[in-house]
From Swiss-Prot:
It is found in: Nucleus, Nucleolus. GO terms for molecular function: ATP binding; polynucleotide 5'-hydroxyl-kinase activity. This is Polynucleotide 5'-hydroxyl-kinase grc3. Keywords: ATP-binding, Kinase, Nucleotide-binding, Nucleus, rRNA processing, Transferase. One of its GO terms (biological process) is rRNA processing. It is an enzyme of class 2 (transferase). Polynucleotide 5'-kinase involved in rRNA processing. Residues 1-132, 603-626 are annotated as: Disordered. Belongs to the Clp1 family. NOL9/GRC3 subfamily. ATP binds at residues 332-339. Its EC number is 2.7.1.-. InterPro entries: Clp1/Grc3, CLP1_P, P-loop_NTPase.
């Protein structure tokens, strides 16, 4: 009998006989797959009680190596496959079985691409698979961080809902609505987006305890994050009644603009959906699906329930008892669960049990001070802010990229950091944090029972630790929570000493990292930024909506940057100074912060430009004589006058704000504030105008101008808006797929007239030309994947990759 190549290579260490070799291999692999096959004797699926450890991501080369390994396994003879059930271990830690074992354990094998494509009946799943089977295929050597893991070869099934839908617990259902009865201590899990209404009993959702009321809560449950668990806490006659209703916010439309938004929501009906839709029809679709286990998902994604550590629950209970006196700072290493804990605590504080006997309900809301510019909760990256929340939040950050609703919450004040990490300018970061804390104290005058939650970034080592200890000692906190029991000691000891000096309680909790991350931090930032520019919330509408048009198709604001009636009074850069001759090129296509200068004190005044003492006294006396009606105009003129002394004019007449040669001093937070972000589409030197795309409400801009504020644009070092460049390409691809589906459907139905085929071919030709033009934009390259696995799965697909615009001494384009 011929030996395999792998057997020949390890012959020296192998047993003597073939029987002994087979027995040794089986004993060696038995412990490796013990957790996977423990329950195969009784069930066809492997159900795990707790989430496994975080798995490493595989690159494209590893995926190709795995596919080659699978092909070698398939070529083994039937005789050897029948004698042995060999388990071959791949580098990424996943387990690949031979053909016989995979046929017996169909629940944990990888679905074939064509089989998965045929199982998806909804357009989202179909479009996602046609575009990219893995969500976003990783391009080798990507430097911008936009890579995502390939599909795992093994999917471990997890229990999600603790109830199974049947005729006894389904109160009523139709094509849009499902009302279920949940017994106490049991729970249900859904994927998608829906409106939740508690009719009877009390249920808990992401830390919030929702009591019966006419209020409806919007819940977003995508596959990128652990799914919310709706659990019955107390009920009427031992059960609670909850109604779930489909909602059409438009956020699913973003799948046509970016592959990052594909395979996020429900796709096709699950077994529980088919049961509840039996009376309506199997063709009906809701915007949510009920899942009993992760195996019910038609797309076979890594779905996990959102569990809460017992120590977390105890800490939240203790902190919430402080009510309005609570001022807590949450810190810890990266990926330790700070955002999840803060969201749970926020929702718990916003949903206390009503006390009618005391005639008291929480109407003061909760203040949320977000000091993490890399992964903020309610604004895009690069900002720190103070938000005032009135309602619990059920969804990841890209489902609420801004707050413009008085009922749900508003942004009190924000400052532009211009980077994803505060280490770029820690002094400016500390000043911004102190100013936001002053705004919170001002808020207490109106809402005296408003607690405060401070979210500190994962910058907890080195200089970041010094900043954290300074904030603990200076902000007047009541509690500090550190999210790691593993230390390290060099971090815990300084935090403990700072808390002791400030007489602040320090609580150390275990970290709870996210399992099976399907999007990287850079991808989540890109998704939140894209959602920010596409979200709209008209006046009088309780929930936001998302628009599907690419930002390049939106009509921009045309603003003058020179002349008497200019809308922008200056442009400044952070972190590093840009040569004036290159300022125009660096601004086109860049993300900038729209900052309002409230007084001249925000500007750095060089000593050479300081006015003489007698002039200051005359100005002071003149200020006393100014009427209140003219005070706003006087303040505006003074600010513009100081801006003039700091600006230099470029060859395009752009007002470039500098505080000296080679220096770039940010605006002082006490006299400036951030209004929002804008995307500069183009600069026209002939008309001296800027074309800006921004979601900032026009009412907010008008209000700032009426107060006499001067608007400036601040360019930082944020991630390049590659998503904006690629939106037209993906929109064209999505339109082509829709047209092809329509043509295929008409042919199958036998509907059509003579001459329709020529019209269809002309239409497809126009769409192909649109795709070609969108693909040929600057800094965008289509990379063809000629991997063996991709050739077998489908025809060669075009994968795009964006290249950053390289500046002087830049290596961003090296290797492409």
């Amino acid at each position: 009998m011929m030996k395999r190549k792998a057997d020949r290579q390890t012959a020296a260490a192998a047993p003597v006989s073939a029987f002994a070799a087979r027995k040794a291999r089986l004993q060696q692999t038995q412990t490796q797959v013990q957790t996977v096959v423990a329950s195969e004797k009784t069930t066809h699926t492997d159900v795990a009680a707790e989430p496994p450890s975080k798995r490493p991501r595989r690159s494209l080369q590893e995926s190709q190596a795995q596919s080659t390994s699978e092909e070698d396994t398939k070529r083994t003879s039937k005789r050897s496959a029948a004698k042995t059930e060999k388990v071959q271990r791949v580098d990424s830690g996943t387990i690949t079985r031979t053909r016989e074992t995979r046929m017996k354990d169909s629940e944990i094998e990888v679905e074939d691409l064509e089989k998965e494509r045929s199982s998806n009946e909804e357009s989202e799943g179909e479009d996602a698979v046609e575009e990219n089977a893995a969500g976003v295929v990783a391009v080798p050597a990507a430097e911008d961080g936009y890579e995502s893991p390939a599909d795992n070869t093994m999917t471990v099934v997890f229990p999600l809902s603790k109830i199974r839908l049947n005729k006894n617990n389904i109160v009523y259902s139709d094509e849009d609505t499902l009302c279920v009865r949940i017994q106490e201590k049991l729970s249900i899990v859904l994927i998608g987006q829906y409106d939740l209404w508690v009719k009877r009993g009390v249920v808990s959702v992401m830390g919030a305890k929702l009591h019966p009321s006419p209020r409806v809560y919007r819940v977003y449950a995508p596959s990128t994050h652990s799914l919310p668990v709706i659990k019955c806490v107390t009920g009427v006659n031992g059960a609670a009644e909850v109604e779930f209703k489909s909602c059409h916010s438009g956020i699913t439309r973003l799948r046509d603009l970016s592959p990052l938004y594909q395979r996020l929501w429900n796709s096709g009906n699950t077994p529980a959906d088919k049961l509840s839709l039996k009376a309506v029809g199997q063709d009906a679709r809701r915007t949510f699906s009920v899942l009993h286990t992760s195996a019910d998902d038609p797309l076979k994604r890594h779905l996990r329930p959102l569990h809460l550590e017992k120590q977390w629950s105890a800490a939240i209970k203790v902190l919430s008892q402080r009510a309005g006196r609570l001022q807590v700072l949450i810190c810890g290493p990266k990926a330790s669960g700070k955002s999840t804990f803060g969201r749970y605590l926020l929702n718990h504080l916003l949903s206390p049990a009503p006390q009618p006997e005391l005639n008291y309900t929480n109407t003061d809301g909760v203040a949320f001070l977000d000091l993490d510019p890399g992964q903020p909760e309610f604004l895009p990256m690069g900002q720190v802010y103070l938000a005032h929340l009135r309602s619990p939040v059920f969804g990841p950050p890209f489902t609420h990229p801004s707050l413009n609703n008085e009922r749900e919450g508003t942004i009190i004040r924000a400052h532009h950091i211009g980077a994803t990490s505060p280490k770029e300018d820690p002094d400016h970061y500390v000043l911004a944090a102190a100013n936001l804390m002053e705004q919170y104290r001002t808020l207490l005058a109106t809402y005296p029972q408003c607690p405060l939650i401070i979210n500190y970034p994962g910058w907890i080592f080195g200089l970041g630790l010094e900043v954290a200890t300074y904030l603990i000692q200076s902000l007047g906190l009541s509690d500090v929570v550190y999210m790691s029991e593993k230390g390290p000691t060099e971090v815990v000891e300084p935090l403990s000493q700072a808390a002791s000096l400030a007489r602040v309680s320090l609580t150390i909790l275990p970290s709870q990292p996210t399992e099976f991350v399907s999007r990287s931090s850079a991808q989540l930032r890109s998704m939140q930024m894209q959602s920010y520019f596409h979200m709209a919330q008209p006046a009088g509408v309780s929930h936001p909506t998302w628009l599907e048009n690419p930002v390049s198709k939106n009509r921009p604001f045309r603003v003058r940057y020179a002349g008497e009636n200019r809308g922008v009074h200056g442009v400044m850069t952070l972190d590093s100074q840009i040569i004036p001759d290159l300022l125009c090129e660096s601004l086109e296509g860049a993300l900038v912060g729209v900052v309002a200068i409230e007084s001249p004190n925000a500007l750095p005044i060089p000593s050479s430009n300081a006015p003489p003492a007698n002039e200051e006294e005359a100005t002071s006396n003149a200020d006393d004589d100014v009427d209140m009606e003219n005070e706003t105009e006087h303040n505006r003129n003074a600010t513009i006058s100081h801006l003039t002394t700091l600006t230099i004019s470029t060859k395009e007449s752009l007002p470039y704000i500098t505080s000296g040669p080679g220096t770039s001093t940010p605006l002082h937070p006490s006299s400036s504030s951030m209004l929002g972000l804008a995307l500069i589409r183009s600069i026209n030197p002939d008309t001296q105008t800027l074309d800006l795309v921004t979601p900032i409400p026009s009412t907010r801009l008008i209000q700032s101008l009426e107060r006499g504020h001067a608007l400036v644009l601040v360019r930082g070092v944020l991630d390049n808006p590659n998503w904006a460049v690629a939106e037209e390409y993906y929109a064209a691809r999505a339109e082509e797929r829709r047209v092809r589906r329509g043509i295929r459907g008409r042919k199958e139905a036998g509907v059509g007239e003579q001459g329709d085929e020529s019209v269809e071919q002309r239409l497809l030709g126009l769409l192909k030309e649109r795709i070609r033009r969108a693909k040929d934009v600057p800094f965008m390259t289509v990379v063809e994947d000629h991997g063996r696995r991709k050739q077998e799965e489908a025809a060669q697909r075009a994968l795009w990759k964006l290249r950053k615009k390289a500046g002087i001494e830049s290596e961003d384009e090296v290797g492409y």
